[in-house]
Amino acid sequence: MIGVVATLNVAAGKEAEFETAMLALAAQVRANEPGNHLYTLCKDDEGNYVVMELYENEEALAAHGQSEHFKASGASFKGLMAGPPSIKRMAVVG
């Protein structure tokens, strides 16, 4: 299993639009990627966002990046981000 934590820099005032777009993407990931076990948007008390992801294997992670819904989602996030995401990849222990 492969874990991914994506820290997202959302533009001020764009939080509601971002959440709508990200939740739509998350629904597509869960519906269309059998190798994905978790794709969840989280927000802390300060308004910082992360997406927590869990994939069965390398093939599932690669399929996510190549999926049509993931590629198409870029247009949904245009103008909503304050900067690039920080992606941290981790191995699942146990």
Describe every region a protein language model picked out:
Residues 2-9, 38-65:
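Short, well-ordered beta-strand segments in beta-rich or mixed alpha/beta enzyme
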Residues 43, 88-89:
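Structural signal for conserved beta-strand scaffold positions within catalytic alpha/beta enzyme cores
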Residues 14, 47, 69:
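Short phosphate-engaging motifs
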Residues 2-32, 37:
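N-terminal first-folded block
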Residues 24-38, 54-88:
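An amphipathic, aromatic/His-enriched active-site/gating alpha helix that lines ligand/cofactor pockets
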Residues 90-94:
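Short hydrophobic/aromatic patches at helix-to-coil boundaries
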